[in-house]
Each structure stands twice: as C-alpha cells, then as structure tokens.
Amino acid sequence: SSSLVGSEMCIRDRLKPVHRRIIYSMYQLKLFKSSSYKKCARIVGDVMGKFHPHGDQAIYDSLVRMAQDFSTRITLVDGQGNFGNIDGDNPAAMRYTEARLQDYTNYFFDGIEENSVDFKDNYDGQNLEPVVLPSQLPNILINGAMGIAVGMATNIPPHNILELIDALKLIIKKDKASLTEILKIINGPDLPTGGEIILDSNEKKQIYKNGKGSFNINAK
C-alpha cells in the first residue's frame, strides 16, 4: 500500500521515498560537497515539481532533518544557515537556508549512471527516478531507521560506521562468523547526541540475536 511504502524505510538504502527523491534531485543538480551551496527553496521546488508533489513544507522538513547532526548520526546533507537546534528552535525558512550533499552521500550513487539499480516513471511519467539508491554502505545500521506503517513498525538505532566496516570485513573474511565474534567489534548503538548506554553483554547479545529489546541512556 502507499501508506506502507511511504512510512517504512527501504532496507537497501535506509531511505523513505521523500529522502531518496531529495538526494537524487540534489545529485541531478550536481550539488556535491565540492560545489557551492544552493538555496533550499530551489531544491524543494525541484523535488516537488519532478518527483514528490506532496507539499513544500514536508519536503523541507525532511531535508532539514538530514542536515541536523543531532538528529542523524552521519548527515546526508550539508546545510548552511539556521537548520534548528537540539533545544527545539525551528530552522529558518527555506528561502534563507542553503544546502549541498555531504561527501558520505557519494556512496549512494555508485554505478547509478550504469543502470546499477532499476528506475521507474515519476508521478506524471515525464521523468525517471530510482527505485532504490545503490548505497555501498549499510546505511540502515549506520543511521538507524524509524517508521510506523499499517500493522508494523521499526526502530533501529544508529551504529558507529568504523565498527560496522570492521564487522563487514570479518564477515567477508570469515563466512560463518559468530554473533559473539561480531559483537566483539560492534560495541552497540552509537547515537548522534552521545551519552552512555546502559546495557550488559548478555542483554546486548539477546537484542542482536532476536532483533528486539531496549536500553537506557545516561546523558553526559
């Protein structure tokens, strides 16, 4: 259903449709880290006109969140201007703020020009958009995921990118690496705001084994 597709993130690139469309539009505009910033109003207009005709404010809110280092473990968007803060102050209007892609986001486009992923028609059949972005990194574990849809929900915490890469190296090198071996590398979730996670080793193992559980966080 459209509710399910719009609410749950795709496991392959950890993006909801609105996030994917923002990033792909910025890719088409060549807003890479090495380029100059562009007004968010222009980016939002491009996304809404080509791919996501669901209101400019919803698009802008999603763009802002991808640029907030207190909301996202590794930001996908490099924002310039007032993008809000952790105390709850709102970002400036899109006509004042500017954005471009982060270097990290380059890993989402490997081979996209060589048909490494499928494309589909946009809402009016005038443009093509990727079904999923060819991310080289496990972004769903790096930045976590949260979504609620009809009959299901997910809440995956973010993790440290260096620990995940080391764990992937172990899995590639040793096909049947045990969970115990993997958890010697991955210490647990790594949240954007820092803090101390209260979780003993047995609880941690059960959470990663079963995919369910909870933990407490002490602020620094």
Residue ranges and their predicted role:
Residues 1-6, 11:
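Single conserved hydrophobic/aromatic residue that forms the stacking wall/gate
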Residues 14-40:
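N-terminal cofactor/phosphate-binding cores enriched in small/glycine residues
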Residues 19-21, 38-46, 77-85, 146:
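Short, conserved phosphate-binding/catalytic loop or strand-edge motifs used
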Residues 22, 67, 151:
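Residue-level signature of catalytic and energy-coupling elements of molecular machines
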Residues 32-70:
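Extended, well-ordered alpha-helical scaffold/bundle regions in very large, multi-domain proteins
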Residues 49, 53, 118-143, 148-220:
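Intrinsically disordered, low-complexity regulatory segments
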Residues 50, 60-64, 70-95:
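Non-catalytic interaction/clamp surfaces of large macromolecular machines
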Residues 82-123:
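Active-site cavity-forming subdomains of large catalytic enzyme subunits
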